[in-house]
Amino acid sequence: MAKQVFQTTFAGRELIVETGQVAKQANGSVVVRYGESTVLTAAVMSKKMATGDFFPLQVNYEEKMYAAGKFPGGFMKREGRPSTDATLTARLIDRPIRPMFAEGFRNEVQVINTVLSYDENASAPMAAMFGSSLALSISDIPFDGPIAGVQVGYVDGQIIINPSQEQAEQSLLELTVAGTKHAINMVESGAKELSEEIMLEALLKGHEAVKELIAFQEEIVAAVGKEKAEVELLHVDADLQAEIIAAYNSDLQKAVQVEEKLAREAATQTVKDQVIAVYEEKYADHEEFDRIMRDVAEILEQMEHAEVRRLITEDKVRPDGRKVDEIRPLDAVVDFLPRVHGSGLFTRGQTQALSVLTLAPMGETQIIDGLDPEYKKRFMHHYNFPQYSVGETGRYGAPGRREIGHGALGERALAQVLPSLEEFPYAIRLVAEVLESNGSSSQASICAGTLALMAGGVPIKAPVAGIAMGLISDGNNYTVLTDIQGLEDHFGDMDFKVAGTRDGITALQMDIKIQGITAEILTEALAQAKKARFEILDVIEATIPEVRPELAPTAPKIDTIKIDVDKIKIVIGKGGETIDKIIAETGVKIDIDEEGNVSIYSSDQDAINRAKEIIAGLVREAKVDEVYRAKVVRIEKFGAFVNLFDKTDALVHISEMAWTRTNNVEDLVAIGDEVDVKVIKIDEKGRVDASMKALLPRPPKPERDEKGEKSERPYRPRHHKDHKPKKEITETPKDSE
């Protein structure tokens, strides 16, 4: 295929798509240029159906450091495992694409996005999402797209599509919305306590922009799209399905309606084991034994799926007996752990999360060095999901994509209410340990995080709570569920997580298994979520009504001082010698930023005070009109040098020592004397002049007589230097001759 170029303008930036030039051996590939961001997307499908009971889709997002003109960090100077941001972007692309493949599709599909050049004002993640959909759409891979996504901001009361970096920094909203031309199918958002009405407006305007991108994709597909390949879909034998349903559907229905999770799982598994045992014996010698048993397992899954949905849509009964808008029993506990800086345990039904707070000096912040300029991340929220939380065994190790994603969602929800660095100069880490799970564990971690922050004395603006909403839809009718449990999440059509305060939403996340949802469903889900959020906040506030006024005794205390930027090198010293000496002497931790903010941390307040004194002395400057108790350190004919403090000396000129005239400095002071001086001048070179006499009483002026005239003083003739007095001649009386 020859190279073809397609071009349009979107959100004020040029959008160019190139096909037929690179990566031509992939099933589909495109180069997307948005602004000066360039992303290569290649989509590949395996030739045969994969084994397993799930669709093996893999979406990667690769950040090449050369795209931003940077070297990779570390010793190897080569890109390694994906960054957290890259992992989250890959999930962001995967989620709207996954529902667009046919039920029963089992061929492995890989979609690889490589960022080749990076423009911080033109969203590379959105270019990658666009490219992923387009590469699949023009390929022969059976994909029921296209889809597209946009970023949405909210600045000065205005909705902005794909905001620039400057606009994003000012925005009260960080929203990504994706979907088809008919409906929204993915949402990811952080927000600064925005109302449901503003969020809905942003979602709908975002979807209007999505439609523009889809129309552009359809134009390209019409020009260069391949005919879709015929692939085998996983279908079960219809006769076998009818046979199993007739024999065992009644037993499975009874098992599904057991209200308690573990008992229900045991009951359904008993029915499934019974069916499997019957058919293993029946077809033990059959040449297609593996296919038949795979069909049996799939049929049982479909039967359970159908019964859960029937109960909710027809009988309006949930598996655990709740109403559609009812929350499971709630419990909140603070101070679950001793010694730590704060802890909260939150339980909702059979979902339970423990959140643990750690406060640290700002030197513990995480340095993020990706395609954007390097920055420091002050707040971290980490989410762990051990297998024992669902009563199973499994792998243990580094967090997977799901754990990273759930941690990021909680981080966005809670970050909106954290105090500023000036108000609370700490690095903050929350770790959520999921101890039990039956759905909505990410939202439980947000509630537990609020408890831990408040118990730990972090002055958050308001408590945050989270709730997960679900959806069961048969095409014509739908039911929105509040606080979905695991079974409803697994067999339902939507997982819509909403977190916020009483004043507004701080985070949204929505994934669906159908191809989209309407504005009507979104409106209803947001309204039900608000009601549920307030109920949970009632429980949190009853447990801990206000943020504690003090930090835990084990938390590091902190004090801050501000120094001039040009004094930073004095405090640090050559090779860090000075600051290391202060730390060794006092036992504190010290952080200094590039603006001269010095943060001193210790559990011992006396140690902090001592370190502050040392630093204040190092950077102290003499000021005009200030008085100092100084020590004479050197004497010259013209005056004495005195030490004001540390390494700062001043000259007291002989004329500034006393009101009476003296010709000898040593008549007034000696080396080692301590004298009070007042600074009277500092010249442009920083040289200090001081005065002793300015602090002494001025001698009285000469007295005046009753007429107000000065009293007479002895006459002292003054002569010009060249004047010679005449010689007096005395005549001798003649009589004396």
From Swiss-Prot:
Sequence ranges of Basic and acidic residues compositional bias: 700-715, 725-737
Repressor found in the keyword field: no
Cellular-component GO terms for this entry: cytosol
Domain S1 motif per the UniProt entry, residue ranges: 625-693
Keywords: Cytoplasm, Magnesium, Metal-binding, Nucleotidyltransferase, RNA-binding, Transferase
Assigned EC number: 2.7.7.8
Transmembrane residue ranges: none
Location relative to the cell: Cytoplasm
Binding-site residues, Mg(2+): 489, 495
InterPro entries assigned: ExoRNase_PH_dom1, ExoRNase_PH_dom2, ExoRNase_PH_dom2_sf, KH_dom, KH_dom_type_1, KH_dom_type_1_sf, NA-bd_OB-fold, PNPase
Cofactor(s) essential for the protein: Mg(2+)
Gene3D superfamilies: GHMP Kinase, N-terminal domain (3.30.230.70), K Homology domain, type 1 (3.30.1370.10), Nucleic acid-binding proteins (2.40.50.140)
Catalytic activity as recorded in UniProt: RNA(n+1) + phosphate = RNA(n) + a ribonucleoside 5'-diphosphate
One Gene Ontology term of the molecular function aspect: polyribonucleotide nucleotidyltransferase activity
GO biological process: mRNA catabolic process; RNA processing
Region span, Disordered: 691-737
Record PROSITE patterns: KH_TYPE_1, S1
Keyword presence, Mitochondrion: no
Domain KH: 556-615
Function field: Involved in mRNA degradation. Catalyzes the phosphorolysis of single-stranded polyribonucleotides processively in the 3'- to 5'-direction.
Family: Belongs to the polyribonucleotide nucleotidyltransferase family.
Name the UniProt record assigns to this protein: Polyribonucleotide nucleotidyltransferase
Species annotation: Streptococcus pneumoniae (strain Hungary19A-6)
Gene field: pnp
